[in-house]
Amino acid sequence: MADNPDPSSLLPDVFSPATRDWFLRAFKQPTAVQPQTWHVAARSEHALVIAPTGSGKTLAAFLYALDRLFREGGEDTREAHKRKTSRILYISPIKALGTDVQRNLQIPLKGIADERRRRGETEVNLRVGIRTGDTPAQERSKLTRNPPDILITTPESLYLMLTSRARETLRGVETVIIDEVHAVAGSKRGAHLALSLERLDALLHTSAQRIGLSATVRSASDVAAFLGGDRPVTVVNPPAMRHPQIRIVVPVANMDDVSSVASGTGEDSHAGREGSIWPYIETGILDEVLRHRSTIVFTNSRGLAEKLTARLNELYAARLQRSPSIAVDAAHFESTSGATSNRVQSSDVFIARSHHGSVSKEQRAITEQALKSGELRCVVATSSLELGIDMGAVDLVIQVATPLSVASGLQRIGRAGHQVGGVSKGLFFPRTRRDLVDSAVIVECMFAGRLENLTPPHNPLDVLAQQTVAAAAMDALQVDEWYSRVRRAAPWKDLPRRVFDATLDMLSGRYPSGDFSAFRPKLVWNRETGILTARPGAQLLAVTSGGTIPDRGMYSVLLPEGEEKAGSRRVGELDEEMVYESRVNDIITLGATSWRIQQITRDQVIVTPAPGRSARLPFWRGEGNGRPAELGEMIGDFLHLLADGAFFSGTIPPWLAEENTIANIQGLIEEQRNATGIVPGSRHLVLERCRDEIGDWRIILHSPYGRRVHEPWAVAIAGRIHALWGADASVVASDDGIVARIPDTDGKLPDAAIFLFEPEKLLQIVREAVGSSALFAARFRECAARALLMPGRTPGHRTPLWQQRLRASQLLEIAQGYPDFPVILETLRECLQDVYDLPALERLMRRLNGGEIQISDVTTTTPSPFATSLLFGYVAEFMYQSDAPLAERRASVLSLDSELLRNLLGQVDPGELLDPQVIRQVEEELQRLAPGRRAKGEEGLFDLLRELGPMTVEDLAQRHTGSSEEVASYLENLLAVKRIFPAMISGQERLACMDDAARLRDALGVRLPESLPEIYLHRVSYPLRDLFLRYLRAHALVTAEQLAHEFSLGIAIVEEQLQQLREQGLVMNLQQDIWVSDEVFRRLRLRSLQAAREATRPVAATTYARLLLERQGVLPATDGSPALFASTSPGVYEGVDGVMRVIEQLAGVGLPASLWESQILPARVRDYSSEMLDELLATGAVIWSGQKKLGEDDGLVALHLQEYAAESFTPAEADQANRSALQQAIVAVLADGGAWFAQQISQRIRDKIGESVDLSALQEALWALVWQGVITSDIWAPLRALTRSSSNARTSTRRSHRARRGRPVYAQPVSPRVSYNTPNLAGRWSLLQVEPLNDTERMLALAENMLDRYGIISRQAVIAENIPGGFPSMQTLCRSMEDSGRIMRGRFVEGLGGAQFAERLTIDRLRDLATQATQTRHYTPVALSANDPANVWGNLLPWPAHPATLVPTRRAGALVVVSGGKLLLYLAQGGKKMLVWQEKEELLAPEVFHALTTALRREPRLRFTLTEVNDLPVRQTPMFTLLREAGFSSSPQGLDWG
């Protein structure tokens, strides 16, 4: 201890005593980076401070500047201009980081202030303010009027301040701190910031000191140059003492042969995910989360973050049910990423929340605080938590899949142990074996500090143009001075004056042609004076259209004109980046449905359904620009090290030392070597050729150099292939290579020559090709927008993307003729420098041509392991979505190569991927048992034995069309001529064809007859192999036990032989003991694919209509058996519980009060009685609310479950002005609380005003409030009375509205004709008071209710429900639910529009019903009110066409009869007219009319006369007799009812 230095000796003598004493009280000693930073700051030098996270560099940057403010405040030496300006400017690349810094600054500010008070020094209070895009306008105004001493902002907000009056608050800035400077230095955002800093310096009397804070970077000099521009910058980069603990975790021994998830886990959600690595990854992550106090799990995409969050919560909930003792101590939150269970389970605890850019900032803040406080154990995030946000004491970071870069990996792992002296602990969970190799290299680079080089954009002219307009909008610019200032910023230090002038020419309207006249100039350039001034509107344009983040558009995906039928054409959206990679006839996937691109327009993608087709690879392009070439070379070097065995013979790094990790790496290398002979690497590329399913060649170049190298290379290759073979090569580039498809050719096979180019020629090809590419067009629009050449019509409002594209295309069309136009130059630079890495490609090509790097070519029968990963990298993402509907999973997987199936899926469940009915059909066909497949004649019998193998006489007869006598005669002849012979096999006497004699002898030891010809006795090379293959090719699916029994062999011999056949590629192992011949599987697959694609086609509207009848409890799921007439409703539910379920499903639906008890409830509850509803109302379990008055005796009424009323009830708006005095008095009485009888209400009003209340007026006022949704009664009796009242009764209650002069309306004498016992006033009345939900909760509840009610959320359903915000708002919510895995999007029902959302089980049930419809014709007809939500016709779907003049409508009193979903009959309101839909010359069954009369009998008082059916007098129609038999009676006018 005596050797430890005195902490005060480590503190530089640059601070005031108060600051020094505070620091020594607060900390044991400064960190390594802090004293060095303070020395540099004290010398007023610019500094780049490089240190890992948790090293105290933020305090190092601030403390000297803070101390100076305290000293000057105490000495009262501040200059006047400084009193109204900020002194310290902190710039953060992310808003949340600024919030953290504001909070953390309070510690030194308060500590130093307290220390000054203790020392008796002058009190100084320094203020901190934040100005970002989230700062309200009022707060921004306050900051401008009264600037804080320390201002925290973002690059974009700094730009806006410099381009407004707020810049005056920056004139006294002395210190600028740029945090996470490495995060912006390599982008246009950083270039934009660099020029903003130069504009800031132009405001100041003395240039501000710049201090940049950075995590570890590879080239400190590059970042320092970016920070300082032409100013010298001192780099503070002490040796990093932090040694992270990193380990790669592989939970299985073979990632490409994952056995089924162990049973007994209690997790139903694993069903259908056999063979997937994901259940093991999820379980492993949950185990680690439970072992640590706080964990951040990083993923590389938002969709994966949402799904992984949901899976972790489901697993945790399942574990908690089995073992309550594992419950974490922390509090739990309601999930905001979408519930993982149904509503009754929504209150379950959960352990993880998601955090990414699509989560609202409020929810992100809640998540961050919960993790910091220990209330939340786990956050699953994307790069949103990668930078320096203070997340508290995080114990562990888990990275799923390889991080996007080495720097990203360091940043993410650095989130753990973030505090000073902490140790970062991280785990990597790779998803594939190739992912494992990449992760190993990333981790090695992290330990070695080999980070990627930053490549700042060079002379970005679009950013220069924008900043020039912004600067000129505030002050007239002297052009030479502005040029000098621009060149002080590092990105433009080499900017040629000619290019600078061309940019000013563009901004000032000096275009090279009159074609540009539509694009107005922004500036005025006086050539004589050299002064640049802004045109009117330039400042507003600069602040409303500024920034560098591209407005990457979304293309609307639509059905062709006329294909929408009754629904919407809109299918969804595609990102612009995806569209530029797409072509006509590509297959894309949106939600659960596949679509073929028919046309790509300026802002739309027109598609047609392509059921079950796999989507094209580019639509699964990952985030980021791809792997840097340098990192790719390191991965290639590592592969060579693995291939030559040197790695395994040396000391294996601890992070790779786990047994599973080593086994998977070794397995991958060995399998790749066996497949291609050479393991691809950095010095030896491999060209692999193999045929695809239809016989075309797939050309796969294995190269590790990354997408930025491969994409431009692919451009040239595509052109060469097109020139050689005259076809679209469909060339696709990825980080691991290039894939091309070439048509089958009899000529020379493609070899390595198609990949070799002269370097200069290759670069020329790429440069020429890129200018006409869709990539160039998309980037041109972004560059033009940054250069402010495409402002919106209304400043401050976003221009629709289609308009942006139109203007950009017009500008591009003009500018393409002028290669020196600045935006053309910038777009070329961006494509060739930022998107592509042409220098790396040129180096690679020179090394290939010089022989330093070799290319070997090989032909394989099936893709090698590396090729499998390259071809189907997107499949892992797709297969993780195991909750896709069954038909889509079958169809998409079945589109893959048969030989790749086992590697992609592991242990495949054939019952899921192969149609069971297809399996049965193919088995019968192969065994010659199917009709039309049986043998005929003598030769047919011989063919049976030759094709199927030895059989008994009985088996042969079963497969022959002849009689048993004929079969016996044929066999006798065959035996006589020695074409067949008898043999004992497996204890049975069978007949075999002579060609099998030696085979049976050598394989099975069968004793042969002595008289066999010698020619049949020669030894066979592979006798057992031949027998097995024939048996497998004659059956659909086979088990080892079947083979063992068939040939009387031991199971070990059978399994060994099967494994050999598998290695030879002749058979496939679909499960542990299910085998299939390759040829048979191809047949099964094609037939199953056809069946699956049929299943993925939208079902008929009648199928959906049938689903709704089943879903809403009108008919049982078993409906479809022969229909039998029943005199009662076929409702599914019974008793009070049944009524409760109906109300739950129809909660909030407004229906005529007259229908609830006459049609709606009886149609679903077979034993319904009014006492059931009264009981629920009396107990308070159910409440009702009025919505709208319908005439004098009816109105729309909704029912609600009391417990969930907030989800279905919309509170009435307080409309005091339109309420009568009596209505206001009633509301005032009920507002005191409780429920009151009408007489009590009257009495309380009289007590208040001292006068009696006219009971008729009271009744009228109460019902007016009912229809306003303000009050309700605790019984249904008032509604019954209302709907049953006759016109006479209504007349008796009418009264004169003439009031006595001078007396209020509620003070009239009591009418003797109305009493308090009137049923219309029965029950206790109360206010409808429901605690409202916020908009998000309300919309989610509406969506869940609609899914329960209708099964599918469609535009029509939203219109029917009158949802606030309409379908666009509901569609936004549904997309979020889709992202979290709750629902799927697709085109499931014909005529329901392109955008439909449903749960997976609903989709599967729809298709089950569609299949049954082809097999069953007998359905129970059921009559419903036309208004019934279970009736889709005229609501969710249009009424079927009918030639009659009567137009059906959904009106109270109208009835429909539906059978199997098909609309058969419509009875109009009033009963006078009827429509009947029937097939030609075919009468409706009597049961249809019995169903109608069953519904009519529910309304005993109903009376009407039916006169017309289909525009004909009813007496002249065949329906006359059927209706009489059903219960109508004849009358002169037609048919009477009642």
From Swiss-Prot:
Residues 1287-1312 are annotated as: Disordered. It comes from the Bacteria. Disruption phenotype: Not essential, it can be deleted. Slightly increased sensitivity to UV, azidothymidine (AZT) or ciprofloxacin (CFX), a radA-lhr double deletions is more sensitive to AZT and slightly more sensitive to CFX. Greater sensitivity to AZT, H(2)O(2) but not to mitomycin C. Residues 1292-1303 have a biased composition (Basic residues). Residues 898-1538 are annotated as: Lhr-CTD. Its cofactor is Ca(2+). Residues 553-623 are annotated as: WH domain. PANTHER family: ATP-DEPENDENT HELICASE LHR-RELATED, ATP-DEPENDENT HELICASE LHR-RELATED-RELATED. This is Lhr helicase/uracil glycosylase. It comes from Escherichia coli (strain K12).
